[in-house]
Amino acid sequence: MMITKTAIALIAIGNIFYAYRCIVGTRAFIDQYGMGDGSAFIIKLAGTFCAGLGFMLAYVLMTGIAGTWELFTYGFVQAALLTVVGYQTVNGPWAEVEGVKATKEGYMAPAIFAVLNAVVLLTGAETLYA
């Protein structure tokens, strides 16, 4: 159970980190990746999704993971999709737009989240599916 809870904590911390960067640190996020001011709303929108998941995971850590498999399945599917889309974007024409600073973070971070969610689904299966 320690591996499961550690993975959940890492996912929660990561999501809260990105939520903060997107919602509170929008300007720094825009400047870091050269996305332009028009991206502010979408960045904040992404931040709200990260915040929602981060807060739900923190709640699960405090109350127990029994019956919460859907939360981690969603986390896995979303992160796996973003890994593919992020890789295509970082290695596609968007990355060549003047001023854009595409980095591997666009697919490496979601890949790590996907792996962590898979770890939770596998190591916590006995409790998650109860």
Over which residues does each language-model region extend?
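Alpha-helical transmembrane segments
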Residues: 2-14, 69-78
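N-terminal signal-anchor/start-transfer transmembrane helix
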Residues: 7-30
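Core segments of alpha-helical transmembrane spans in multipass integral membrane proteins
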Residues: 13-18, 40-62, 77-84
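Cytosolic, membrane-interface loops and tails of multi-pass inner-membrane proteins
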Residues: 23-40, 94-99
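Juxtamembrane helix-loop boundaries in multi-pass membrane proteins
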Residues: 35-50, 72-75, 99-113
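Membrane-helix boundary connector in multi-pass membrane proteins
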Residues: 65, 84-105
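Hydrophobic alpha-helical membrane segments
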Residues: 72-90, 110-117
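Juxtamembrane boundary at the C-terminal end of a transmembrane helix
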Residues: 119-130
